[in-house]
C-alpha cells in the first residue's frame, strides 16, 4: 500500500481486503484490542556499547567485558520509555558505566548484580534528547 499526494486536511477513501490494512494516527487517542509489541533488540556487547533508541523500546545486553560503558543513546525522543535487560555472562562480576545522558535517583549510577548469569532490568523514560531517567531492578529470576 502506498500513499502519495495527500496533504493535511484532505479526506481520502481507502478500500482494502479485511485485515490487510491497519492504520494508526499520531494525533489522537486510540484503543487497541491486542497488545502493540515491539521487538526485543540485542545490543552488541563490548567495552563500549552503542544504543540506537530508534530500533525498539526494549533491549537486551549480555555483559562479557570486565567493564562496559553504555554510550549516550542516539535517536532519543521525549516520551519514549522501555527496558533493557542487563545480563551477566557466566563469569559474572562485570561492571557497567553510563554516559552523561543517564540520570538515576540520588545522582548515583546503578550498581548491577554480580553473580554469574544474573539478570537486572534498567527501565527508562526519556524526558528530553539528553535526559534519560533510569531505575534498575536487580537480581531478577534468570532468563
Which residue ranges define each predicted feature?
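Acidic, glycine/polar-enriched metal-coordinating patches/loops
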Residues: 1-28, 61-143
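Short carbohydrate-recognition loop motifs
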Residues: 55-61
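Extracellular beta-solenoid/beta-roll
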Residues: 31-55
Amino acid at each position: 500500500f502506498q500513499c502519495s499526494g495527500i496533504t493535511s486536511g484532505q479526506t481520502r477513501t481507502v478500500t482494502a481486503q479485511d485485515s490487510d490494512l491497519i492504520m494508526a494516527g499520531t494525533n489522537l487517542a486510540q484503543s487497541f484490542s491486542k497488545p502493540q509489541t515491539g521487538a526485543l533488540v540485542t545490543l552488541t556487547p563490548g567495552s563500549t556499547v552503542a544504543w540506537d533508541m530508534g530500533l525498539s523500546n526494549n533491549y537486551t545486553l549480555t555483559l562479557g567485558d570486565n567493564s562496559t560503558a553504555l554510550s549516550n543513546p542516539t535517536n532519543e525522543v521525549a516520551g519514549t520509555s522501555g527496558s533493557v535487560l542487563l545480563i551477566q555472562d557466566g563469569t559474572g562480576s562485570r561492571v557497567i558505566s553510563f554516559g552523561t545522558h543517564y540520570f538515576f535517583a540520588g545522582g548515583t549510577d546503578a550498581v548491577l548484580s554480580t553473580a554469574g548469569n544474573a539478570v537486572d532490568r534498567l527501565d527508562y523514560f526519556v524526558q528530553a534528547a539528553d535526559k534519560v531517567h533510569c531505575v534498575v531492578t536487580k537480581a531478577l529470576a534468570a532468563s
